[in-house]
Swiss-Prot record:
GO biological process: glycoprotein catabolic process
Family: Belongs to the transglutaminase-like superfamily. PNGase family.
InterPro entries hit by this protein: Galactose-bd-like_sf (IPR008979), Papain-like_cys_pep_sf (IPR038765), PAW_sf (IPR038680), Peptide_N_glycanase_PAW_dom (IPR006588), PNGase (IPR050883), PUB-like_dom_sf (IPR036339), PUB_domain (IPR018997), Transglutaminase-like (IPR002931)
Protein name: Peptide-N(4)-(N-acetyl-beta-glucosaminyl)asparagine amidase
PAW domain: residues covered: 442-632
Species lineage: Eukaryota, Metazoa, Ecdysozoa, Arthropoda, Hexapoda
Chain ranges of the PUB domain: 33-96
Function, as annotated: Specifically deglycosylates the denatured form of N-linked glycoproteins in the cytoplasm and assists their proteasome-mediated degradation. Cleaves the beta-aspartyl-glucosamine (GlcNAc) of the glycan and the amide side chain of Asn, converting Asn to Asp. Prefers proteins containing high-mannose over those bearing complex type oligosaccharides. Can recognize misfolded proteins in the endoplasmic reticulum that are exported to the cytosol to be destroyed and deglycosylate them, while it has no activity toward native proteins.
Database matches in SMART domains: PAW (SM00613), PUG (SM00580), TGc (SM00460)
Keywords: Cytoplasm, Hydrolase, Metal-binding, Zinc
EC code(s) of this entry: 3.5.1.52
GO cellular component, one term: nucleus
The reaction(s) this protein catalyses: Hydrolysis of an N(4)-(acetyl-beta-D-glucosaminyl)asparagine residue in which the glucosamine residue may be further glycosylated, to yield a (substituted) N-acetyl-beta-D-glucosaminylamine and a peptide containing an aspartate residue
Organism encoding this protein: Drosophila pseudoobscura pseudoobscura
Length: 632
């Protein structure tokens, strides 16, 4: 993990003083201009890392001398980024050994801070950079007791069977979630109000569907809908999937595994690329995962299960013998355990591993603060065949082992809690004996197709009713410009003057600045490191609209330029139009218009994937959607 010096970033920002309003504005303008120049310099390095010209800052350059280096603290920041200055030279140079990952992190946080100041916000402290994360990552997390102490308990099993011994170790490990200081930190990192608001909106939409007769399902519980929002936020914004750690020289993630070693309690994968070794720490300690926020399915499930506990869900960590880890959360409304796979952003689709992923399943166990359960039968529907595969221990001995672990976990529970757990366990065991047919979506290895879950995830008609109207800066420039990066899932409004771009506003997530959409979602391909907007699976068509309104001004459209990248396969078809509200495609001299994209066609089970908007690499810094409107 690459850390950056946030103090240097914060130091160059305008300070609250008793100076006049004009003086404060001058200081702010100087800061904005200096950071703009620095961002351009860093952007050049990132775009052409091997060009030595871009790694040199000449001190005889007037703009560098008068606008960048004149800002108090800027030289210290340059050193923090990695630039070096020697007395004999008249320049700063950025050595090749400074990693692109470090440069990118400084670029991201400086850009974010500048945008905040530009929009009028005056944040108290700089946010820690995180490409796909809206919540600042703390640099250090305090716990009540050290990690090893949190997961160490007296052994109760007397078996020599290593497989059974591992069950007790897994059960002990989840007890780290109950650290009060850790729980408080976790709660502070979750945007609970925002997620609850989204869940409430989805619930009201579903209530309308039920009232109109369009949906025959039972009204969902707000806590269940909040769980879906939490899963989506965690997968798309909070945690980052890592195949290989980035090379510190070239930034590539194609490095080869050289060896695995142990440092303290942490297993470390050592990769090599460009002759340099890089380390990927496979943390189990939640206090470390809340800082790094990256990993694979094990880290995903471990951290997500903990965050569920932060919101007081009864949650348990699920380990399978086929090398996959996920979460189960108890729904108090449905009185059953819900399967949640945070690394795949999937809720309530337990049979997908057996029927969609085609995995061989023999043992699956779930662990919580006061329970341990053999849940293999929830994830299979051919129980007799599965029993034939279970050869690691005697079934009777397995039951005795789980009972012993369960008793260990419940020894400090109240009589009332023990009675509740006993009743719940009995009902769960009865439910686990039932076999059911997989849904169509489980057969294809993806999330449940239930309308309630699709609606709660926003996978239906989504009306945000966001309309763009020119602000003061845009009116002054007679411009209305909007661009979108699918890699970062961010919109930017900006003005352009002689090639110089000034950011005005940013909007996080593709839904945030749309007018409406139907059957659209953002697909992230971790293996290929690509992102794009596509149709929902099993839908024949989709639509998304962005709307613009000039009626409250005396301006109209003079001309426009549109970059709108699409990709189709086979018989897939995408229609893109810029039109007035009454459907006319000539928008010059209009005061209202909209951009409309319609996706349709394709064949087979992956027809939805044959129409894609804004497909780009997750590392791309381009804007596949860029609309520039000139007004008069």
């Amino acid at each position: 993990m690459v850390d950056i010096n946030l103090e240097c970033v914060h130091f160059i920002e305008p300070k609250n003083t008793r100076s006049t309003e004009q003086q404060q504005q001058n200081v702010k303008n100087a800061y904005l201009e200096a950071v703009r120049i620095l961002l351009v310099l860093l952007e050049n390095v990132l775009s052409q890392p091997n060009n030595t010209k871009f790694r040199t800052i000449r001190l005889d350059n007037k703009a560098i001398k008068e606008k960048l280096l004149s800002l108090p603290g800027c030289e210290k920041l340059l050193y923090a980024i990695g630039f070096r200055h020697t007395p004999s030279s008249n320049s700063y140079t950025l050595p090749g050994e400074v990693s692109l990952q470090q440069i990118q992190k400084y670029y991201d946080v400086l850009r974010e801070r500048r945008t905040a100041w530009l929009s009028g916000a005056m944040p108290k402290s700089p946010a820690h950079p995180k490409a796909a994360c809206s919540t600042p990552s703390p640099l250090f997390i305090k716990t009540s007791v050290p990690y090893r102490q949190r997961i160490t308990f007296p052994r109760v099993l007397r078996t020599s069977n290593r497989f059974l011994q591992s069950l007790e170790l897994y059960s002990d490990a989840v007890m780290q979630y109950e650290d009060e200081l850790l729980l408080a930190t976790g709660r502070s990192l979750i945007p609970v109000d925002d997620l609850t608001s989204k869940a409430s909106e989805k619930m009201m939409a579903m209530q309308d569907l039920i009232a109109s007769g369009e949906c025959s399902e039972k009204e969902p519980c707000i806590r269940d809908l909040l769980l879906v929002e939490l899963t989506n936020w965690f997968n798309t914004q909070f945690f980052e999937w890592v195949n290989n750690i980035q090379c510190q020289v070239c930034g590539s993630e194609e490095s080869k595994l050289r060896r695995t070693q142990t440092e303290g309690d942490v297993r470390v994968e050592v990769n090599v690329c460009c002759g340099q070794e890089s380390k990927f720490y496979r943390y189990n300690d939640i206090s470390q995962l809340l800082v790094s926020r990256k990993g694979r399915c094990g880290e995903y499930a471990n951290c997500f299960t903990f965050l569920c506990r932060c919101l007081d869900y009864d949650a348990r960590l699920v380990h399978s013998h086929f090398d996959h880890v996920w979460t189960e959360v108890f729904s108090e409304t449905q009185m059953r355990w819900l399967h949640v796979d945070p690394s795949d952003n999937v809720v309530d689709s337990p049979l997908m591993y057996q029927h969609g992923w085609k995995r061989g399943i023999d043992y699956v166990f779930a662990y919580s603060r006061d329970d341990a359960q053999d849940v293999t039968w929830r994830y299979t529907n051919n129980h007799q065949e599965i029993l034939k595969l279970r050869k690691l221990c005697d079934e009777k001995e397995l039951i005795q082992t789980l009972n012993a672990i369960r008793e260990k976990r419940q020894q400090n529970c109240s009589a009332e809690r023990k009675n509740f757990l006993s009743q719940r366990n009995m009902f769960e065991v009865i439910g686990l004996t039932l076999e059911r047919k997989p849904t169509e979506n489980e057969l294809k290895g993806r999330s449940s197709g239930s309308l309630s879950w699709r609606q709660s995830r926003g996978e239906h008609t989504f009306t945000n009713i966001f309309v763009f109207s020119p602000n003061e800066a845009e009116l002054k420039k007679c411009q209305l410009n909007l661009r979108y990066s699918c890699a970062t899932d961010t919109y930017e409004r900006y003005t352009k003057d002689d090639g110089q771009i000034t950011l005005l506003n940013t909007y996080k997530t593709w839904q945030s600045a749309q007018f409406s959409s139907k059957n659209i979602y953002r697909k992230v391909e971790r293996d290929w490191k690509m992102a794009y907007l596509a149709r929902l699976e099993d839908t024949d068509c989709a639509e998304i609209i962005w709307k613009f309104d000039l009626t409250k001004t005396n301006l109209k459209v003079k001309s426009y330029k549109l970059v709108f990248e699409t990709k189709t396969f086979g018989e897939g078809k995408i229609d893109v139009s810029v039109q007035t509200n009454d459907g006319k495609t000539f928008i010059e001299n209009s005061s209202e218009f909209q951009v409309v994209a319609k996706l349709m066609g394709g064949k087979g089970d992956v027809a939805w994937q044959h129409t894609q908007l804004f497909r780009q690499s997750l590392n791309s810094r381009e804007y596949p959607f860029d609309l520039q409107v000139e007004l008069h």
